[in-house]
């Protein structure tokens, strides 16, 4: 598990300011044993429920896209209005279960 100081260093090295909101989002995304898939709405809900933090949906959206642009996340477009993000940035295949709306490696 990464420490807050490691997130700060990684963000600064990438040219991103280590704001309180970005650090909280890093904590949710990268302090896990396994990689996972999520939507921006799922992530915002998780932050609100598990960290008891108020971070606007716009901030979550902008941060996720900044992380994607820096190569920390991969975006998987399901259709024109549905995207998932993956913390596993290696090249691999995905399968989308339309019945459960679940993205599977």
Task: Give the label of every model feature segment.
Residues 27-32, 46:
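Short amphipathic alpha-helical elements of helix-turn-helix/winged-helix folds
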Residues 69-105:
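Non-DNA-binding regulatory cores of transcription-related proteins
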Residues 39-52:
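DNA-recognition alpha helix
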Residues 20, 32-38:
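Short capping segments at the starts of secondary-structure elements
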């Amino acid at each position: 598990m990464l420490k807050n100081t490691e997130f700060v260093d990684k963000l600064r090295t990438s040219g991103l300011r280590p704001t309180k909101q970005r650090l909280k989002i890093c904590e949710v995304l990268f302090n896990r044993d396994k990689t996972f898939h999520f939507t921006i709405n799922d992530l915002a809900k998780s932050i609100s429920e598990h960290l008891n933090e108020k971070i606007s949906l716009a901030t979550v959206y902008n941060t996720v896209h900044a992380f994607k642009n820096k190569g920390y996340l991969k975006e998987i477009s399901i259709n024109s209005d549905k995207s998932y993000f993956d913390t596993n940035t290696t090249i691999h295949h995905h399968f989308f279960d339309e019945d459960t709306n679940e993205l599977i490696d």
